[in-house]
Swiss-Prot record:
Residues the record marks as site: Essential for activity: 184
UniProt protein name: Prephenate dehydratase
UniProt superkingdom: Bacteria
GO biological process: L-phenylalanine biosynthetic process
Annotated gene: pheA
Catalytic activity reported: prephenate + H(+) = 3-phenylpyruvate + CO2 + H2O
Organism lineage string: Bacteria, Bacillati, Actinomycetota, Actinomycetes, Mycobacteriales
InterPro entries: ACT-like_dom_sf, ACT_dom, Chor_mutase/pphenate_deHydtase, Preph_deHydtase, Preph_deHydtase_CS
Organism: Mycobacterium leprae (strain TN)
Length: 322
């Protein structure tokens, strides 16, 4: 490709754009052509991911996890329920906010305040202490909150320093966050393909669909434990098809090319109703020991398709499930 097209949660000035700029500077965007890349702001995280599925973008940069509120549900749901996508890189940002206004506005003038819900949750205590009388209005991003101030729709906004600069606003208060170690993790998502090479400090992620029977979830998770693999996250999300049915997101330390991780994925493929591989990528995490693989079987062929970026390719004649 001559220009890599990357969709992200917009408009311009969001923390997501800042994360994308960091990934670009670190050389984490695959297949960047001679003409560089083109950033494309979208109105929502699902819109950014759907742009990749539809071919309008090569990659999407989206938030996936926050240290205060946990996982970003729209991102997880879209990755699990839509057609297959794969994570290729990640970065983490320290998150601090500014309270911004137009020039000439003081704290006493603030009657309405726009905030992205995730941002509002991270400055709730500060707002209660300093702007308790302001009416909180929702924004679909931090940059949109700043835009609402610039357009005169609200008096003030909780937003990022980048967005404030883009919209020519001034900060009444800067560096605001209730928890001093607030951080958000962002991922770069594309169509399925060969994962980045193993670095020794990698993360692997998958979504498990498990039959509703006693002991099935414990048995699935045991495939990691018996191999000494560190699970860094497990989370359930509703399938959206029937009440009381769930998908399970798991993140582990390691790479699909680590023997123990490969064996765990193959065991899950045999055991679970479905396994959606979300990728293996550099994440700064230490890995455990590796082992030599056993002779090939259907699960080995399935794993080979994941490594080749072809998760939907049919099994060879005589093979098991897809």
């Amino acid at each position: 490709m001559s220009v890599a097209r990357i969709a992200y949660l917009g408009p311009e000035g969001t923390f997501t754009e800042a994360a994308l700029l960091r990934m670009t500077a670190a050389g984490l965007v695959p297949d960047t052509g001679p003409d560089g890349l083109r950033r494309w702001p979208t109105e929502s995280t699902p819109a950014a991911l759907d742009a990749v599925r539809g071919g309008a973008a090569d990659y999407a940069c989206v938030p996936i996890e926050n240290s205060i509120d946990g996982s970003v549900a729209p991102t997880l749901d879209n990755l699990a329920i839509g057609s297959p996508l794969q994570v290729f890189a990640e970065t983490t940002l320290d998150v601090e906010f500014n309270i911004v206004v137009k020039p000439g506005i003081t704290a006493a003038d603030i009657r309405t305040l726009a905030a992205f819900p995730v941002a509002a949750a991270q400055v709730r205590q500060w707002l209660a202490a300093h702007l308790a009388g302001a009416e909180l209005r929702p924004a679909y991003s931090n940059a949109d909150a700043a835009r609402q101030v610039a357009y005169g729709q609200v008096d003030a906004a909780v937003t990022s320093p980048l967005a404030a600069t883009r919209w020519g606003l001034i900060a009444l208060a800067a560096g605001i966050v209730d928890e001093p170690n607030a951080r958000t993790r962002f991922v770069l998502v594309g169509m399925p393909g060969p994962p980045p090479a193993r670095t020794g400090t990698d993360r692997t992620s998958a979504v498990l669909r498990i039959d509703n029977a006693p002991g099935m979830l414990v048995a699935a998770l045991a495939e990691f434990g018996i191999r000494g693999i560190d699970l860094t996250r497990i989370e359930s999300r509703p399938t959206r098809t029937e009440l009381g049915t769930y998908l399970f997101f798991v993140d582990c330390v390691g790479h699909i090319d680590d023997g123990v991780v490969a064996e765990a994925l193959k065991a899950l493929h045999r055991r679970c109703a479905d396994v959606c591989y979300l990728g293996s990528w550099p994440a700064g995490l230490a890995t455990g020991p590796t082992v030599s693989p056993p002779p090939p079987d259907e699960a080995s062929r399935w794993l080979a398709r994941l490594r080749a970026g072809k998760p939907d390719q049919a099994s060879e004649p005589g093979g098991g499930k897809l």
